[in-house]
C-alpha cells in the first residue's frame, strides 16, 4: 500500500508536474500545493480543466464527449469523479501545511 499524501522529495529543482498542471489550468502560483502528486491520472483521463483554483474557490470543466455511458449522456461516475476531484483539491488548498489534507 502506498501513501499518496505524504510529501516526497523531488529529483530536480524544476517542478515535476509543470506541464501537467499548466495543461489542466492550474495557475503557477498554486503549483506548490500539488508539488508531489500533480493532478492525478483520472483528471488526465477525464480531461478536467480547472477554471478557478484558489483557497476560496475551485471550479473546473469536463467534456461530455469521451465520458459518456452507453446512451450517450454523461456517465454518473464521471460526474462523481469531477465532484470528488473538486472536493479533494479544495481540501488540499485549505489543508496546506497540515499532514494529510483529504
Feature roles, as predicted:
Residues 1-102:
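Terminal targeting signals and extreme-terminal segments of soluble enzymes
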Amino acid at each position: 500500500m502506498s501513501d499518496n499524501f505524504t510529501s516526497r522529495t523531488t529529483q530536480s529543482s524544476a517542478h515535476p508536474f509543470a506541464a501537467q498542471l499548466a495543461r489542466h489550468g492550474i495557475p503557477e502560483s498554486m503549483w506548490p500545493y500539488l508539488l508531489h502528486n500533480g493532478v492525478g491520472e483520472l483528471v488526465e483521463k477525464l480531461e478536467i480543466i480547472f477554471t478557478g483554483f484558489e483557497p476560496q474557490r475551485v471550479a473546473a470543466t469536463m467534456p461530455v464527449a469521451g465520458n459518456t455511458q452507453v446512451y450517450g449522456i454523461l456517465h454518473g461516475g464521471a460526474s462523481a469523479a469531477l465532484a470528488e476531484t473538486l472536493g479533494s483539491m479544495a481540501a488540499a488548498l485549505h489543508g496546506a501545511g497540515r499532514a494529510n489534507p483529504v
